[in-house]
């Protein structure tokens, strides 16, 4: 894994979109991770076929069933990953799984909001908690003293739509559950950056850009491959000063 240097990486929501793009990019690096754990809520369905094809091609890629809305599924996934790591820690956790709903302010209801928060905020919280022992182990094993993705890190994929300062932008005038839940994810990440700093775990947020995906639509400015490549480039350069940061795919600071 050129630049990152970690032994193991886990990506949630990896069966399509940005998650699948990150997995592809990790596997194509000149020095790829020893283990790439690609999580999917339903690994056996048709939309996960591309990921299954990669698993058959790359022996270092492990497909893990993980439903970010189920605490039982999350715990089972953590046990699966721990078994594969055979006593070693997990270097990098990328919380990418998320849902998007275009519902507007006048029509959003309780169920819309609950579903948005459950996947986009509570999911990353519970996933991070479940994999925390493995992240701590990786940080303890590392000879590095500072914070980095090659030592131990939690990266939460957020959005400019979660920026309170950018709330008036025309292109984000709807999707109330998504916007509110991503703003909450940003705060969660700040709390993680404070709470896990002494454990040697870097925590930060990254906005992947407007990407051509099922979620972002085909009007996006970036392809999945472009976004994934840029994101990994940013992650490879993170250090202590970036703990708690909110950056975009180019590494520029995002407004809160």
Residue ranges, per PLM feature:
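Conserved active-site helix of classical SDR/Rossmann-fold NAD(P)-dependent CH-OH oxidoreductases
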Residues: 20, 24, 122-125, 182-190, ...
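Conserved mid-core alpha-helix of short-chain dehydrogenase/reductase
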Residues: 73-76, 123-130
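Conserved Rossmann-fold cofactor-binding substructure of NAD(P)-dependent oxidoreductases
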Residues: 68-88
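Rossmann-fold scaffold of SDR-type NAD(P)-dependent oxidoreductases
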Residues: 12, 88-98, 120, 155-158, ...
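Catalytic loop of short-chain dehydrogenase/reductase
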Residues: 99-122, 132-197
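Canonical Rossmann dinucleotide-binding motif of NAD(H)/NADP(H)-dependent dehydrogenases/reductases
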Residues: 1-37
């Amino acid at each position: 894994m050129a630049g990152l240097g970690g032994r193991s990486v886990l990506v949630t929501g990896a069966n399509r979109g940005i998650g699948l793009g990150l997995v592809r990019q990790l596997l194509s690096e000149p020095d790829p991770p020893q283990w790439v754990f690609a999580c999917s809520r339903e690994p056996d369905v048709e939309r996960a076929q591309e990921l299954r094809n990669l698993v058959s091609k790359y022996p270092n890629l492990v497909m893990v069933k993980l439903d970010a809305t189920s605490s039982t599924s999350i715990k089972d996934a953590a046990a699966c990953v721990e078994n594969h790591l055979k006593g070693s820690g997990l270097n990098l956790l990328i919380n990418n799984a998320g849902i998007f709903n275009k519902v507007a302010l006048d029509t959003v209801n309780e169920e819309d909001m609950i579903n948005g928060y459950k996947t986009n905020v509570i999911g990353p919280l519970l996933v991070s908690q479940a994999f925390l022992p493995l992240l701590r182990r990786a940080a303890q094993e590392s000879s590095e003293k500072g914070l980095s993705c090659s030592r131990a890190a939690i990266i939460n994929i957020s959005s400019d739509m979660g920026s309170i300062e950018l709330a008036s932008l025309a292109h984000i005038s709807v999707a109330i559950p998504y916007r509110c839940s991503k703003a909450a994810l940003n705060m969660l990440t700040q709390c993680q950056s404070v709470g896990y700093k002494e454990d040697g775990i870097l925590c930060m947020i990254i906005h992947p850009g407007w990407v051509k995906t099922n979620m972002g639509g085909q009007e996006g400015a970036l392809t999945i491959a472009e976004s994934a490549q840029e994101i990994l480039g940013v992650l490879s350069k993170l250090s202590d000063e970036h703990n708690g940061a909110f950056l975009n795919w180019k590494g520029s600071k995002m407004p809160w």
